Regions:
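Short helix-coil boundary/hinge micro-motifs
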Residues: 1-159
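Cys/His-clustered metal-coordination modules, chiefly Zn-binding fingers
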Residues: 127-208
Length: 208
């Protein structure tokens, strides 16, 4: 299995406006090819740090004090949970019910994770953030499980959307004023689709 941050071909994207969706978006399409930004435990931990799910001290404990087997187990748990979250997001977008298996997966992680909530300042106010403790292997995924439960309990499901580009697999939580966001980002998909549409119109009507 490929491990190590150096193997990443693309930087992490944080365009989902929600931790669960940003985690799902570590799988993306690059030049028409499915690409996984998580190649091993080091990548997973790096993402958790960048997403403010764990701090650098916890990350150092995992990468310097955990054995290879424990690191691999954490990575596999993360990938499995990501698969659960992707299915959950797809069902929300399709207006389908969430399967009990997803709830079981979320609760399983929450039940095994020591930690505590903290009040964190953010732009325009405050938010509550779960601070996990790295003593337990499952503890590193606790903030993601907490975010998933928050999305299901407090989020507006109608604002969970998949990018309007059929070739894109990224999800986002629409926080725009009128909730009219269609693209994962203008840079990745929005501008390209607009340019393509303009080109097609010019072909169909050269006088434009």
């Amino acid at each position: 299995m490929t491990t190590g941050r150096a193997q990443l071909r693309q930087p992490f994207l944080f365009v989902g406006n929600h931790p669960c969706l940003d985690f799902i978006n570590t799988q993306m399409i690059v030049r028409g090819n499915p690409t996984d930004l998580l190649g091993g435990c080091e990548d997973l931990v790096a993402w958790l740090v960048q997403a403010h799910m764990v701090d650098k001290v916890q990350a150092t404990v995992v990468m310097t004090q955990w054995g290879h087997e424990d690191q691999e187990q954490l990575f596999e748990q993360g990938i499995t949970f990501r698969r659960t979250l992707r299915d959950m997001a797809a069902r929300i977008v399709a207006r389908k019910s969430i399967p009990d298996s997803a709830i079981v997966s979320i609760n399983k992680i929450l039940s095994r994770c020591p930690g505590y909530p903290q009040l964190v300042r953010k732009k325009g106010g405050y938010t509550r953030q779960f601070q996990s403790q790295a003593a337990q292997k499952d503890g590193l995924l606790a903030p993601l499980a907490e975010a998933a439960s928050d999305l299901l309990c407090s989020g507006k499901w109608s604002l969970v959307k998949k990018c309007g580009n059929p070739a894109c697999i990224l999800y986002f939580y629409d926080t725009t004023k009128n909730h009219t966001r269609n693209w994962c980002s203008m840079q990745l998909c929005g501008n390209r689709k607009k340019v393509a549409a303009h080109y097609q119109r010019k072909r169909n009507n050269p006088t434009l």
